[in-house]
Structures are given as C-alpha cells and as structure tokens.
C-alpha cells in the first residue's frame, strides 16, 4: 500500500452541456479516493459524452453496438522505458451521461452517487482490476464499496442481493 500525498492530474472534458453533470472537482475527488493508498502519482483523462459518442466508442473498441455507462482505456507503458523512470499516465475514462442518468433513475440511485460509483469502477479498471469471473467481480465490488463508503456513498450493489 502506498502512503503519502497523491499527485493527481485529471483532465476532464464534457462533450455535451454541463448542466446537471458533476463538476470537475467532484470527478477529481472520486478519482483521488479510488487511488488513495494504491498509487502516488497519476495522470488520467475523463470525457463525459452523449449516447452517440458512447455508442460509437463502444462499437469501435469493444465490438458492442450500444452506449455503455463507462469505458476504461488503460495507458500502455512504452516499450524500452528505462528502469526507474516513472510513467504516471493511467489512461482514459469515457462516461456516457445519458446512460448514467437512465441507470440511476431505473435503480433508484442518486445521480451523483452513480457517477461516483462508475468513476471509481473505471479507475479500478485502469489500475488492472477486472470482473471477468465471480471471484474477481466480488473482490472488485468489495473494493468499490469500501472506497464509496469513505466518500459517504451507500453500497451501490445493495439492491442486487
């Protein structure tokens, strides 16, 4: 576990009007919570998109022709990077605002809490976490619960049990 302050650079862009969307400071707080104790230095980008762009990216990169809530694109460490040279670039997150809003409504969740959950979920993917099998999924979900609890956000999986 990494201790000490985190140097964090989060570039946030909005591909649609910001009204009703979380402020950049909220996204930064959620990212910092996900990284706390795990990594000391990180650069990443978050892009909040509409359904059309979300669908296009999901189709292009995952072969799935629908908009999804969050896409994670981990950075690749350049080959031949000298040992000891830091490479703080984590990658990019794409969050599809209409999908997040629809899911929050359908699941009876506060919109900001759902954005926080999906941001944390996406950052964990950038750190190498996955949920391809039940054991991985449970471990990742438990970590998400712990991070969100530190942010004062209820268990996002409580209604699924």
UniProtKB/Swiss-Prot annotation:
One of its GO terms (molecular function) is metalloendopeptidase activity. Pfam families: YbeY. Its cofactor is Zn(2+). Belongs to the endoribonuclease YbeY family. This is Endoribonuclease YbeY. It comes from Stenotrophomonas maltophilia (strain K279a). The gene is ybeY. The keyword Translocase does not apply. Zn(2+) binds at residues 121, 125, 131.
């Amino acid at each position: 576990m990494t201790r000490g302050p985190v140097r964090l650079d989060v570039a946030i862009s909005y591909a649609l009007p910001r009204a009703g969307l979380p402020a950049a400071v909220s996204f930064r707080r959620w990212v910092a919570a996900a990284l706390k104790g795990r990594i000391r230095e990180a650069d990443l980008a978050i892009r909040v998109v509409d359904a059309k762009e979300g669908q296009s990216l999901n189709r292009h990169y995952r072969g799935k022709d629908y908009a999804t809530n969050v896409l994670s694109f981990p950075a690749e460490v350049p080959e031949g990077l000298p040992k000891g040279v830091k490479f703080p670039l984590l990658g990019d997150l794409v969050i599809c605002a209409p999908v997040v809003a629809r899911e929050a409504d359908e699941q009876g969740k506060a919109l900001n809490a759902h954005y926080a959950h999906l941001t944390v979920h996406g950052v964990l993917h950038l750190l190498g976490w996955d949920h391809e099998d039940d054991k991985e999924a449970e471990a990742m979900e438990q970590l998400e619960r712990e991070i969100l609890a530190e942010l004062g956000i209820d268990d996002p999986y409580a209604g699924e049990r």
